[in-house]
Every structure is written in structure tokens, then in C-alpha cells.
């Protein structure tokens, strides 16, 4: 469901997919090939939330930003996979990342490109992680550097969800 808010109407590419039970609210930009799946909420009522090309927001996720100006926007790069029930708040996610199921990423945090945030991780406010990091725990810490070969497999996850979104689009419209 696309919901305008305070004179901001979500800008959803015709080549993107939004599940009927998902809510895209206010200042949101979804690029080509991106998808927001079932029962997820992307709430751009404080500032812009941008979802990059071929990125997927899986079932039950919440994306929101803070009313504090410095955390009022969110950027999700290209080819990002955000796992089921993740909560992202006022953060920046680099290209090619995998955000694990049930993880929480707080205001002002930056996840470097081609990184993995493990399932259930808690990334506290203001933390910055370098590219190619495996980030796990509560509070989250870098536990190792991932190889470029492993990072390439993350792109495959995003491509797989893009193909699935195309199938949903055919069936559901």
C-alpha cells in the first residue's frame, strides 16, 4: 500500500514491487528492481528513505528514521538483502550487504559495502563498520573480514529476490 504523508508521496519505480500487505509511507524512493515484501513497513514520515536498485526488504521488516535531523534519512544501497523482521532506523547500508533476520540497526550507524550483519545482531547508534565486515552479536562487533568471493554470493541473494519479485508481480499485479 502506497500512502502519501505531509505532501510526500512515495516514489516507487514501475520496475519495483510492493506487496499488498506492505506499507510505503511518505518520503520514500524505491529504485528499479527493488522490492518490499509482505507485512513490512517503510515509514518516511521524518525524512527520505531510499532503497537502491535490486535491493529487497523481506517480510516483517520495519524501516524508519528519527525526528532528530541528523538521523532523519536512511540510505540502503544497491543489491542489499534485508532479512525477515529486521529493524533499520536512520542508518546507512552500503551496496551488496546482507542484513540478517531479526537484526536491529540504530540511528547514525553505517554498514560498509559488501558486509554481513548476522541474524539477531544489535548495531548500536553511531557505529561505523568497514566494507567486507562480518558483524555479529549484541552489541555488534566485527568478527572477521569476508572475502570478495563470499561477498559475490551476497549479490546472488539480491538477484534471487528480484526474480521472485517478478514472479509475484505477474501473479499479484
Describe the predicted segments one by one.
Residues 151-173:
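Acidic/histidine-enriched, glycine/proline-rich intrinsically disordered or flexible terminal extensions
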Residues 5-135, 140-142:
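Structural signal for interior beta-strand "rungs" in well-ordered beta-sheet cores
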Amino acid at each position: 500500500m502506497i500512502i502519501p504523508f505531509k505532501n510526500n508521496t512515495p516514489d516507487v519505480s514501475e520496475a519495483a514491487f510492493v506487496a499488498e500487505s506492505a506499507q510505503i509511507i511518505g518520503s520514500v524512493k524505491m529504485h528499479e528492481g527493488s522490492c518490499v515484501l509482505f507485512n513490512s513497513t517503510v515509514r518516511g514520515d521524518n525524512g527520505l528513505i531510499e532503497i537502491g536498485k535490486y535491493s529487497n526488504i523481506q517480510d516483517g521488516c520495519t524501516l524508519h528514521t528519527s525526528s532528530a535531523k541528523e538521523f532523519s534519512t536512511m540510505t540502503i544501497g544497491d543489491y542489499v538483502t534485508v532479512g525477515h523482521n529486521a529493524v533499520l532506523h536512520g542508518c546507512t547500508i552500503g551496496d551488496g550487504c546482507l542484513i540478517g533476520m531479526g537484526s536491529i540497526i540504530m540511528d547514525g550507524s553505517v554498514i560498509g559495502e559488501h558486509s554481513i550483519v548476522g541474524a539477531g545482531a544489535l548495531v548500536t547508534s553511531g557505529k561505523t563498520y568497514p566494507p567486507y565486515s562480518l558483524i555479529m552479536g549484541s552489541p555488534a562487533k566485527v568478527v572477521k573480514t569476508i572475502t570478495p568471493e563470499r561477498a559475490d554470493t551476497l549479490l546472488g541473494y539480491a538477484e534471487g529476490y528480484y526474480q521472485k519479485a517478478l514472479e509475484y508481480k505477474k501473479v499479484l499485479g
